[in-house]
Swiss-Prot record:
Disulfide bonds: none annotated. Belongs to the bacterial ribosomal protein bS16 family. Residues 88-121 are annotated as: Disordered. PANTHER family: 30S RIBOSOMAL PROTEIN S16, SMALL RIBOSOMAL SUBUNIT PROTEIN BS16M. Keywords: Ribonucleoprotein, Ribosomal protein. This is Small ribosomal subunit protein bS16. The keyword Glycosyltransferase does not apply. Residues 90-111 have a biased composition (Basic and acidic residues). GO terms for cellular component: cytoplasm; small ribosomal subunit. InterPro entries: Ribosomal_bS16 (IPR000307), Ribosomal_bS16_CS (IPR020592), Ribosomal_bS16_dom_sf (IPR023803). GO terms for molecular function: structural constituent of ribosome. It comes from Prochlorococcus marinus (strain MIT 9215). The keyword Glycoprotein does not apply.
Length: 121
């Protein structure tokens, strides 16, 4: 599978990144199939080769999370709302509590039904 990811270069503590297309099993700084752009996190500078990126995306290349946000900012991908981890945990807890309540109500309902059936017999 082809991934669109960041390849690190630059001095120590002054990293810059190239946006590259590479095989998903290759190393982070290994030889890429194609260089598609540039990103400097210190100056927030981003350069994208839009034509090459579009062709790679249509071929089925999967961007990593960071590259996806860069492409969304560049207008190449539609923005997808991704819930934060904290919101997801809170939702799960609410769902668990709701399921527990429904199970308790079902258990109480089945007990009353079985009791009324025995009384009728």
């Amino acid at each position: 599978m082809i991934k669109l990811r960041l390849k690190r270069f630059g001095k120590k503590k002054e990293a810059s990144f190239r946006i590259v297309a590479c095989n998903s099993t290759s190393r982070r700084d290994g030889r890429p199939l194609q260089e598609l752009g540039f990103y400097n996190p210190r100056t927030k500078e981003t350069r994208l080769d839009t034509e090459a990126l579009r062709t790679r995306l249509t071929q089925g290349a999967q961007p990593t999370d960071v590259v996806r946000t860069l492409l969304e900012k560049g207008g190449l991908l539609e923005k997808i709302e991704r819930p934060s981890i904290a919101i997801g945990k809170a939702k799960l807890e609410k769902e668990k509590k709701a399921k527990a309540k429904t199970k308790e109500e079902e258990n109480e309902g089945s007990k009353t039904e079985s009791g009324s059936n025995e009384a009728e017999s």
